[in-house]
């Protein structure tokens, strides 16, 4: 296959994932503005932002069926139209109800982007190159986490959040049109699939002891990381570290860059460590443990530069993504797709729960001048750290449920 076709596939579908990542974190910049304009509480803000993740989660199984039946080109282009409609609904709303509908539509609309990118890559790239290609796809998506930091903050100095919403909708339609027009048509699928079978497969995975052994630590750390990165890290920087809004926005971008480096770096290092006798399961566990350690250091307010702490938070925050590779080692090939889809589903449900929960806990304190007391944030972070430590115990305990699957040559 010509390299130009492969590059076209990569950039088109990576652009789709970039769009989904921007939508994931855009409320970081919007939050103080919509809170002021519409009088939202922290609980309202947490629920509103988390609807992206619940929309993403509930769409996973139907999206998997659509991808198998129609292929990534048509499904991605069509679903992104819903995302554009969602952000326009969001930007035009003058009450919490309209904002919630818009945010839910966005989550549903972009729910296909990452899975479609992985599927399109699998159709056009050699298997040996997929880990690297998928890592770069994650990195391009991570640029969205950079954009919602300083660039978005600067843009909001000269325009309104409603105008930015209109622009995001237009950009989303441009990406959708590019995928529809320029992605290869010959890779569209026509496999028969049904939602009932997918639900049965998901339920089978959820009853698996091996799944929960592998997923226990990663779903909690990933849930915490993305819940904080997409909303609550900025208030922490402002209220606890006493940073200026501009400094906080810059550190959000630092976190995004660090996460990109972490995803690519840990993905590349994992197989090298495995050749040295360190399993991907153990390597992933060490990375997640370091992520928890960074959170402890932040809560204790150790005298380190904020940029150093946020960079470490980003680098180690994404290491749980290695659990997808671990799943492939312990589930037979015909179950890997369902195992990874189920893992994504659980992670996004937890992100939803954590975002709502953080907002609910913060709302027990009365904000002063738009800021919550430091003790409120420390309480939230301490609870989240405790949950991660509890899940880590299950992850490291000896188990008889993990047995690597032997792959037979085909």
Language-model regions: role of each:
Residues 27-28, 209-266, 328, 351-359:
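Extracytoplasmic gate region of multi-pass secondary transporters
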């Amino acid at each position: 296959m010509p390299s130009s076709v492969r590059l076209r596939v990569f950039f088109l579908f990576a652009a789709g994932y970039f769009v989904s990542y921007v939508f994931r974190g855009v409320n970081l910049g919007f939050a103080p503005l919509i809170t002021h304009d519409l009088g939202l509480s922290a609980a309202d803000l947490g629920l509103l932002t988390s609807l992206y993740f619940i929309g993403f989660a509930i769409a996973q199984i139907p999206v998997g069926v659509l991808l198998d039946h129609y292929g990534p080109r048509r499904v991605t282009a069509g679903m992104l139209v819903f995302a554009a409609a969602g952000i326009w609904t969001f930007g035009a709303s003058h009450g919490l109800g309209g904002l919630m509908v818009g945010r839910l539509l966005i989550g549903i609309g972009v729910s296909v982007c990452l899975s479609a990118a992985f599927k399109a890559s699998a159709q056009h790239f050699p298997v040996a190159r997929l880990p690297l290609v998928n890592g770069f796809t994650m990195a391009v998506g991570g640029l969205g986490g950079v954009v919602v930091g300083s660039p978005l903050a600067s843009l909001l100095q000269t325009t309104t959040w409603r105008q930015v919403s209109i622009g995001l909708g237009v950009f989303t339609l441009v990406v959708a049109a590019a995928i529809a027009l320029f992605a290869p048509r010959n890779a569209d699928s026509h496999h028969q699939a049904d939602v009932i079978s997918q639900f049965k497969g998901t339920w089978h995975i959820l009853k698996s002891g091996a799944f929960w052994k592998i997923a226990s630590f990663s779903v909690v750390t990933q849930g915490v990381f993305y819940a904080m990165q997409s909303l609550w890290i900025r208030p922490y920087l402002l209220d606890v570290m006493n940073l200026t809004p501009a400094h906080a926005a810059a550190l959000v971008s630092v976190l995004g860059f660090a996460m990109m480096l972490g995803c690519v770096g840990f993905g590349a290092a994992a197989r090298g460590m495995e050749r040295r006798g360190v399993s991907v399961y153990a390597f992933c566990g060490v990375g997640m443990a370091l992520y928890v350690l960074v959170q402890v250091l932040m809560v204790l307010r150790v005298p380190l530069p904020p940029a150093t702490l946020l960079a470490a938070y980003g680098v180690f925050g994404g290491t749980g993504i290695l659990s997808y590779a671990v799943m492939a080692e312990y589930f037979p090939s015909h179950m890997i797709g369902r195992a990874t889809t189920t893992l994504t589903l659980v992670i996004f449900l937890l992100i939803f729960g954590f975002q709502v929960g953080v907002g609910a806990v913060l709302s027990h304190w009365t904000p002063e001048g738009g800021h919550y007391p430091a003790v409120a944030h420390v309480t939230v972070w301490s609870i989240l750290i405790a949950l991660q430590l509890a899940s880590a115990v299950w992850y490291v305990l000896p188990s008889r449920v993990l047995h690597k699957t032997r792959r037979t040559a085909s």
